């Protein structure tokens, strides 16, 4: 699973996920990719599940880039625990996603196969996404 090797603080505040993505909103490495259309958060298991689905579809040909990294700890208190007694322990690592953010990129695969693989990955993600190419990238989301 993806997670930081070391952090300055073990736990973080929740924060707010507002606005649109100004960084990481265009294809940088591949020729086709997945772009988020709405706010959400993605955890390391979802990132890995989508990556495995894509890799199996393209039979390990081409190259896949993961453009997101879960660096925010999500905490949870144990079940049937009374309130108080401090913040819960870290349960998983997530990343807040804003509309316009590129999640995955792919190159070295023919476009029809790449679209099928990216569609499989889109089903694994918890927010609306669309497939973008270098030509269609300039469209408004």
UniProtKB/Swiss-Prot annotation:
Q: Which domain of life is it from?
A: Bacteria
Quick check: keyword tRNA-binding in the entry?
yes
Q: Which UniProt keywords apply?
A: Ribonucleoprotein, Ribosomal protein, RNA-binding, rRNA-binding, tRNA-binding
GO CC: one term?
A: cytosolic large ribosomal subunit
Which PROSITE patterns does the record match to this protein?
Answer: RIBOSOMAL_L16_1, RIBOSOMAL_L16_2
- Per the record, where are the segments of Basic residues compositional bias? 1-19
Q: Where is this region: Disordered?
A: 1-22
The record's CDD domains line, in alphabetical order, gives: Ribosomal_L16_L10e
**Molecular function (Gene Ontology), one example:** rRNA binding
- Similarity comment: family membership: Belongs to the universal ribosomal protein uL16 family.
Q: Which NCBIfam families match?
A: rplP_bact
Task: Describe the task this protein carries out.
Answer: Binds 23S rRNA and is also seen to make contacts with the A and possibly P site tRNAs.
Q: How does it assemble?
A: Part of the 50S ribosomal subunit.
What name goes with this protein?
A: Large ribosomal subunit protein uL16
- In its UniProt entry, the species of origin is given as Nitratiruptor sp. (strain SB155-2)
State the taxonomy lineage: Bacteria, Pseudomonadati, Campylobacterota, Epsilonproteobacteria, Nautiliales
